[in-house]
């Protein structure tokens, strides 16, 4: 089966191998390969790609850059983009501007210089460039404007018109300079032209465009290049060597080329430039591509434009720069701990980079273990399959205990109130009970809330105290020198504690030092009960943000004058204990020792636990599903600051999983570092394997003082290896990779720096965590001996990899749609029942044949359930009083019409009798739309005939063979959209309905900001090229998650969501109404059904118009003369064009209100529905109107109804003219995608005497065409709204301002039309300087002006009557504004005012401010505009208040 255009596009994306953030851009979802024209002689491929909307420039540029690279060995490439619904903004214009200027082949330097100095702005649907005077404006129009406009259109800005305007302020001072420059340029052009003639006469040497680069003189490879970072000033000659990360070749007006490339040696970066001298240089320019290593020699000069040092290259040549290799002999290691750019704001490279490197190194497998997420899995699967590598699917979870005990050895029911306590605290030389020493031990003995004895001893550790210890504890060497020995103090303390309950704050820390000390000296283990006040506080108050001793002391008013001295801390902890015990007794009835642990693990106990890292792998396919469930639980049920996995849940889902001890943040390493071997052994028993990492990875722990030095670090690692041996668990060496190469470390450093103090990694230097080779790892662990190093690095990593099944896949290989019993029969029944009701039984042949063809395709290909879901959603919305508009080509399906999914009838134009089902069809194209037929009575029964049918072929929806998966997009009212979404839950269940998830990554501009902040905070001055390199390195990293605005995924009843993806809340918002897919929905688009349930203003407005008027929208005629007159003038409105500043009466009418479309209406004056369809198609298409139909109409060749408007017209026109159906369809498909018409089809068209030549030429110009069904649905809604504008104007304006308007100048609107006109003029006078908000306001003011000119009034808000959101009709001529129309008054305040008013009337401005939550600024606004004239400033007391 031939690939669909979308499938071809997906295949192209795979070939382009785009960066993950680009590949996951939601705008690529609609992508299609519309055409590829192959020019065999010139070896050029012309690609035409199609999208729904203009691509973000970063995405477009990535495709445009990659395309020639991928095909460079085959052919040159050219790229055009066709966009179905282009929404052009100032931001998009600016983002594409430099690309457009570079690729527009502008002929003169003056024009290029002018363009490079400014960016066009959008004014009245045109892109405007300002010039200094009229001469330059004319010169720009002659030399470059058309090329700029055409280049914009080629990249998707269909319909964009460019305009040059004179900036009068600069005109006088610039005239002389311009004339001199033009004279000079004219002379240069003449000289250049002569040179071109001379060159063309000479025989040109042909040079291949592939192979090594060699330009200028050969450079000696023995000469060492200069480090870029050392070049800080202009120099006559430098030689550098580096990696090319950006390249551009510009065509100059002199016909020479300018090569500009950015190169880095990772110490810094440079821009290098070189001008061509003939075709040999140009061929060499073509060889220079991103990813190459070049040696460059030239001068360093300050660039006149950028003011930065730039290399003017004289000599350039390719140098060999081999990628890192893994030269270890024999079997290679497997990396089992690896983070990709899906580890949120923490790691750099996509998994595909690691897979490529692992394959090159000969590794048989590789793991992915991102922080708390699995979002790299789809890409990992694709990359691994492509490389033939085994992928190990894992995750680094945040493991927490379900609850930490409050008390230890607490089995006896000892009465807490009367118990005797020893509250103690230790001060130490560090945090490790294994490697640090106690230097102070203090305690108080308490009973009945009073101190009855004290213990305080200093201990000499036998070595000088560190500065950190002295500063933290305020204990000096003099204070401990000559003190008692550790063993003596411990013996005394054991006696002091005899029989008492021991108490401490974070007591496990203190007990750990005692346990290790007692063991070290052969003393008896602690057997006293122990209470931890830290955990007691957490158990009682999980809502508190911290439970530090000093924080709690303040809350409970306990004195703590010398915090971090043992005696002070001990006494404060004692008094805190009594306060907490009283709360425990009051809250939970805890009065005895054995009751303190009753609530361990209850409620939100998981929030109080400190997370530890652990690695979890899916060992089997069933294990992968358990992993999906585990990650879902952590994101949905156990999310607190980070996704958490309670140990009990991991145990419950452990089947098919492998659990490893992870990094230094894992509990085994932490226990070994801080508590000792016994504790570490107990923790290690939980895991399937243990992990250790290279010494440099632990460097931050040494820097922080948590580990005293490398000797202690090695001791910890050796003891973990020993524990593994004792427990018979493999110990494996992992790299904890966060980026690919060592030079990538700077990208992570910048990323972490951007997060400030919120990220604990900012407190110390970052470790070296690049992707290490086997040989590197063996070197890192060589201190263990060759045999042991090989065991940890190679043997055990492969052993664990072998534990995992080979055939695990996280992505399905086909589409799974929900099954609805009897759906095929029900659909057929509904369709045929409606058809018989409308057209009789038996059906007319044309209807019966059409339905038979459609139903065979729909049912035969399993599409019935998709129709069924859409049908149920639409019927539900209609029942609830909201019409639904269809989008796209679903109106091409008569079955969809008969099922009630769409109002659009695709049959040929026809009459239909609602009484006796008589019908009469017009099948030869003589009528464009059934709505245009003249009124007529039924010849059989005399009833008024209904008119319908728009002649739309079914093939435009499901393809010529009817086997294309239907994409049914529906426009629900924006108000009703949430209800429609929730109805899917009703239909399929909450566990089978999910919002489509998205992943937000660091964008290029954001990354640029990170780099600039890093530059500022580190006191550096980076070159622009280096900033660009660093920003490139940080783009694409996961920042957050989100949700598709309309997409709902439906899981089949016999499956669950974990068969496809984990789930989560968007952006970790635990209060979100919907859960989303954890995977970006694009990655599972082909596996699970997605319904696009969109929100739109038109159905909302129709509902409001119906509510206010009582008129049923479907009863509104489609050929009302007054409505049709709006499209050719303003007479229907009772105003002149001058009054409303528009020659057409379509302001505020969907599809027809913009200046661009109003201009089309002025030229064409449509009078029928079919002509309005033409306008819709012409305005949405690319190269359909401008330079095409517009010219044909102007020249009088054809009329509006004859030109090609919508794509479907082509197929139906050609069929009506006698061409074969399949050829007509194929020609339509080629033309609508901008692919032209192949020669043999053109020949067939020209041989058909019915096909006009102008028609063929028009087809050849078209780049994109709008579907007729889409246009029909939109215009049907537009005509209904327009009908109210003509016949119920006050209702229309009330609905428009309520539904469509967001920005208001209420003061102007309420003061009348002169004030509105003045406000409009103020905005229009700003021209290009007007803000986006002002331009949006201008549209609202235009409607307000029209409303006022028609004799209506807009009233300022009334505190006693206004609604919070909607405008209200006050009388036959007046509309009352809502509170939200007041500038700066948001929806919440508006609702609060109405709620407070309903409780009781406002007594004063003070009362309004207090109960309505209205700010002083808003009170002042209302006062100024006389809203509050009847209210005093303050509440006034009455003599009789309170007497009754």
Swiss-Prot record:
SMART domains found in the cross-reference section: EXOIII (SM00479), POLIIIAc (SM00481)
Q: Name one GO cellular component term.
A: cytoplasm
The record's annotation in Pfam families points to: DNA_pol3_a_NI, DNA_pol3_a_NII, DNA_pol3_alpha, DNA_pol3_finger, HHH_6, PHP, RNase_T, tRNA_anti-codon
CDD domains the UniProt entry points to: DEDDh, PHP_PolIIIA_POLC, polC_OBF
Q: Please provide the record's keywords in A-Z order.
A: Cytoplasm, DNA replication, DNA-directed DNA polymerase, Exonuclease, Hydrolase, Nuclease, Nucleotidyltransferase, Transferase
Q: Which domain of life is it from?
A: Bacteria
Q: List where in the cell it is found.
A: Cytoplasm
User: Which reaction is the catalytic activity of this chain?
Assistant: DNA(n) + a 2'-deoxyribonucleoside 5'-triphosphate = DNA(n+1) + diphosphate
GO biological process terms, alphabetically, are:
DNA-templated DNA replication
Per the database record, which ranges form the Exonuclease domain? Answer: 421-577
Which GO molecular function, any one, fits this protein according to its record?
DNA-directed DNA polymerase activity
Enzyme nomenclature, EC number = 2.7.7.7
The record describes the protein's role as:
Required for replicative DNA synthesis. This DNA polymerase also exhibits 3' to 5' exonuclease activity.
Q: What family does the entry list?
A: Belongs to the DNA polymerase type-C family. PolC subfamily.
UniProt-recorded name of the protein: DNA polymerase III PolC-type
């Amino acid at each position: 089966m031939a690939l669909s255009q979308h499938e071809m596009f997906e295949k192209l994306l795979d070939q382009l191998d785009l960066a993950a953030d680009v590949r996951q851009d939601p705008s690529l979802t609609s992508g299609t390969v519309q055409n590829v024209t192959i020019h065999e002689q010139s070896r050029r491929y012309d690609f035409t790609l199609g999208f729904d909307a203009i691509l973000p420039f970063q995405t477009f540029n990535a495709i445009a850059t990659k395309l020639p690279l991928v095909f460079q060995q085959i052919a040159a490439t050219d790229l055009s983009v066709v966009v179905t619904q282009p929404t052009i903004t100032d931001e998009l214009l600016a983002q594409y501007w430099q690309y457009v200027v570079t690729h527009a082949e502008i002929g003169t330097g003056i024009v290029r210089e002018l363009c490079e100095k400014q960016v066009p702005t959008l004014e009245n649907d045109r892109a405007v460039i300002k010039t200094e005077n009229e001469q330059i404006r004319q010169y720009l129009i002659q030399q470059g404007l058309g090329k700029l406009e055409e280049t914009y259109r080629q990249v998707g800005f269909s319909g964009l018109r460019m305009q040059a305007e004179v900036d009068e302020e600069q005109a006088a001072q610039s005239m002389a300079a311009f004339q001199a420059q033009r004279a000079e340029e004219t002379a240069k052009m003449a000289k250049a032209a002569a040179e071109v003639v001379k060159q063309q006469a000479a025989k040109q040497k042909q040079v291949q465009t592939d192979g090594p680069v060699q330009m200028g003189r050969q450079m000696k490879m023995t000469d060492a290049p200069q480090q870029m970072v050392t070049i800080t000033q202009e120099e006559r000659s430098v030689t550098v060597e580096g990696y090319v990360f950006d390249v551009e070749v510009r065509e100059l007006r002199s016909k020479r080329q300018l090569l500009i490339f950015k190169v880095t040696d990772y110490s810094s970066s440079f821009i290098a430039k070189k001008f061509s001298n003939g075709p040999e240089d140009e061929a060499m320019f073509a060889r220079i591509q991103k990813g190459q290593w070049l040696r460059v020699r030239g001068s360093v000069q300050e660039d006149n434009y950028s003011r930065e040092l730039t290399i003017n290259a004289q000599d350039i040549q390719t140098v060999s720069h081999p990628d890192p290799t893994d030269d270890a002999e024999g079997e290679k290691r497997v990396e089992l701990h690896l983070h990709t750019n899906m580890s949120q704001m923490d790691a750099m490279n996509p998994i595909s980079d690691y897979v490529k490197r692992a394959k090159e190194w000969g590794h048989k497998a590789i793991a992915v273990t991102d922080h708390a997420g699995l979002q790299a899995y789809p890409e990992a699967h694709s990359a691994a399959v492509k490389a033939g590598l085994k992928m190990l699917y894992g995750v680094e979870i945040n493991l927490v205990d379900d609850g930490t005990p409050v008390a230890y050895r607490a089995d006896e029911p000892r009465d807490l109130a009367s118990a005797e306590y020893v509250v103690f605290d230790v001060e130490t030389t560090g945090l490790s009970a294994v490697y640090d020493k106690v230097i102070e031990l203090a305690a108080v003995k308490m009973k009945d809330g009073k101190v009855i004895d004290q213990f305080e001893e200093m201990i000499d550790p036998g070595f000088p105290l560190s500065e950190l210890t002295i500063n933290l504890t305020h204990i000096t060497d003099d204070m401990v020198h000559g003190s008692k020995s550790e063993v003596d103090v411990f013996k005394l303390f054991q006696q002091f504690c005899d029989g008492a309950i021991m108490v401490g704050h974070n007591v496990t820390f203190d007990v750990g030092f005692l346990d290790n000390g007692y063991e070290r000296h052969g003393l008896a283990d602690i057997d006293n009960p122990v209470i931890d006040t830290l955990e007691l506080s957490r158990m009682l108050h999980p809502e508190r943000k911290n439970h530090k001793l000093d924080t709690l002391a303040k809350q409970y008013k306990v004195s703590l004058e010398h915090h971090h001295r043992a005696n002070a801390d001990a006494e404060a902890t004692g008094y805190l204990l009594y306060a907490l015990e009283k709360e425990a007794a009051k809250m939970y009835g805890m009065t005895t020792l054995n009751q303190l642990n009753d609530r361990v693990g209850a409620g939100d106990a998981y929030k109080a636990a400190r997370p530890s890292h652990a690695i979890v792998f899916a060992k089997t396919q069933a294990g992968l599903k358990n992993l999906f469930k585990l990650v879902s639980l952590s994101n949905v049920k156990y999310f607190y600051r980070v996704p958490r996995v309670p140990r009990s849940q991991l145990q419950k889902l452990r089947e098919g999983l492998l659990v490893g001890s992870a990094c230094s943040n894992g509990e085994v390493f932490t226990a070994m570092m801080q508590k000792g071997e016994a504790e570490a052994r107990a923790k290690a028993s939980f895991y399937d394997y243990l992990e250790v990492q290279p010494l440099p990875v632990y460097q931050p722990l040494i820097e922080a003082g948590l580990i005293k030095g490398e000797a202690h670090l090695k001791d910890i690692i050796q003891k973990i290896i020993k524990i593994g041996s004792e427990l018979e668990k493999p110990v494996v060496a992992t790299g904890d990779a966060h980026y690919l190469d060592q030079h990538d470390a700077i990208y992570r450093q910048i990323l972490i720096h951007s997060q400030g103090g919120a990220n604990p990694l900012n407190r110390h230097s970052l470790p070296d965590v690049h992707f290490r080779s086997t040989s590197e790892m063996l070197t890192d662990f060589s201190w263990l001996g060759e045999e042991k190093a090989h065991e940890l690095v190679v043997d055990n990593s492969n052993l664990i990899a072998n534990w995992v099944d080979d055939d695990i896949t996280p992505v399905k290989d086909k589409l799974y749609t929900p099954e609805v019993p009897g759906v095929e029969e029900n659909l057929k029944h509904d369709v045929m029942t409606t058809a018989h009701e409308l057209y009789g039984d038996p059906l007319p042949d044309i209807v019966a044949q059409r339905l038979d063809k459609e139903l065979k395709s729909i049912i035969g290909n399993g599409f019935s359930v998709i129709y069924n879901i859409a049908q149920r959603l639409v019927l539900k919305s209609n029942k609830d009083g909201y019409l639904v508009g269809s989008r796209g080509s679903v109106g091409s399906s008569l079955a969809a019409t008969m099922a009630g999914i769409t109002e659009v009838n695709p049959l040929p134009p026809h009459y239909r009798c609602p009484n006796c089902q008589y019908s009469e069809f017009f099948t030869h194209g003589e009528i464009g739309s059934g709505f245009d037929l003249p009124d007529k009575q039924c010849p059989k029964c005399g009833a008024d005939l209904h008119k319908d049918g728009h002649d739309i072929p079914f093939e435009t929806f499901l393809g010529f063979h009817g086997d294309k998966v239907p994409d049914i997009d529906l426009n629900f009212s924006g108000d009703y959209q949430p209800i429609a979404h929730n109805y899917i839950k009703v239909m399929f269940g909450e566990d089978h309905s999910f919002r489509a998830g998205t992943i937000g990554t660091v964008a290029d501009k954001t990354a640029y900001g990170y780099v600039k902040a890093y530059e500022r905070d580190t006191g550096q001055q980076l070159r622009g090229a280096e900033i660009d390199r660093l920003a490139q390195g940080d783009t694409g990293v996961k920042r957050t998650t989100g949700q598709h605005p309309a997409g709902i995924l439906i899981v089949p009843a016999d499956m669950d969501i974990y068969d496809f993806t984990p789930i989560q809340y968007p952006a970790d918002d635990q209060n979100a109404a919907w859960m989303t897919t954890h995977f970006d929905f694009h990655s599972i688009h082909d596996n699970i059904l997605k319904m696009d349930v969109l929100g739109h203003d038109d159905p909302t407005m129709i509902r409001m118009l119906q509510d206010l008027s009582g008129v049923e929208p479907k009863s509104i005629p489609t050929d009302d003369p007054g409505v049709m007159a709006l499209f050719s003038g303003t007479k229907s409105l009772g105003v002149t064009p001058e009054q409303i500043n528009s020659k057409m009466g379509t302001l505020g009418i969907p599809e027809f209100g913009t200046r661009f479309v109003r201009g089309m209406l002025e030229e064409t004056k449509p009078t029928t529905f079919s002509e309005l369809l033409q306008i819709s198609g012409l305005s949405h298409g690319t190269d359909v109107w401008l330079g095409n139909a517009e010219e044909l109409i102007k020249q009088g060749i054809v009329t509006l109804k004859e030109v090609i408007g919508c794509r479907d017209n082509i197929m139906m026109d050609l069929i009506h003219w006698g061409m074969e159906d399949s050829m007509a369809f194929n020609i339509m498909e080629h033309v609508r995608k901008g692919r032209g018409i192949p020669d043999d089809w053109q020949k067939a068209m020209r041989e058909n005497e019915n096909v006009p030549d102008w028609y063929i030429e028009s087809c050849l110009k078209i780049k994109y065409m709008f579907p007729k069904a889409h246009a029909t649905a939109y215009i049907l809604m537009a005509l209904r709204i327009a009908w109210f504008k003509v016949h119920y104007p006050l209702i229309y304006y009330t609905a428009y301002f309520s539904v469509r308007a967001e920005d208001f100048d209420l003061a102007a609107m309420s003061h009348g039309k002169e004030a509105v006109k003045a406000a409009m003029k103020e905005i229009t006078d700003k021209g290009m300087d007007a803000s986006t908000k002002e331009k949006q306001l201008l549209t609202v003011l235009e409607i307000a002006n029209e409303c006022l000119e028609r004799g209506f009034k807009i009233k300022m808000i009334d505190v006693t009557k206004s609604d919070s959101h909607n405008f209200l009709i006050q009388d036959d001529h007046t509309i009352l504004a809502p509170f939200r129309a007041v500038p700066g008054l948001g929806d919440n305040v508006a609702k609060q005012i109405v709620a407070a008013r309903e409780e009781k009337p406002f007594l004063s401005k003070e009362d309004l401010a207090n109960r309505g939550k209205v700010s002083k600024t808003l009170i002042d606004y209302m006062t100024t505009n006389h809203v509050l004239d009847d209210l005093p400033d303050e509440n006034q007391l009455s003599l009789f208040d309170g007497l009754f």
